[in-house]
């Protein structure tokens, strides 16, 4: 893999990390998304972050959270209100990528969400995130999953 491609992957990974933190903050505080984004950009070194992708994830996941929740609810084993805040933010981000970014292979979406859960979530959050998003990918990416088998 070229260094340019590696840098692009790393920039998207960093965008996801900042986005999940912003989504979590919004869930807890309901601060306006533009304030969350402005503060995050002001307080962090973001020169190696895909800023366009960060902006998209943060704004679109928050704007579409009800639609994303409607996708998640059928594949959850508990009420959505019972989810840990970090898990919910990560699941919403993963659901958004599965639904709206078909150019990203579903396994990459799952792997990235698992890494977010390992970094920010509880001890076994990554296992739960993997299970939920795998079930959701069976609905949203069924043809892709069949080809991968």
From Swiss-Prot:
Q: Which SUPFAM superfamilies match?
A: NusB-like (SSF48013)
The organism's superkingdom is given as: Bacteria
Task: List, alphabetically, the GO terms of the cellular component aspect.
Answer: cytosol
Please tell me whether the keyword Transcription is annotated for this protein: yes
**Biological process GO annotation list?**
DNA-templated transcription termination; transcription antitermination
A Pfam family for this UniProt protein?
A: NusB
- Tell me if RNA-binding is a UniProt keyword of this record: yes
User: What family is it from?
Assistant: Belongs to the NusB family.
The record ties this protein, via NCBIfam families, to: nusB
Which HAMAP family does the entry mention? NusB
What is the recorded name of this protein?
Transcription antitermination protein NusB
**Encoding gene, per UniProt annotation:** nusB
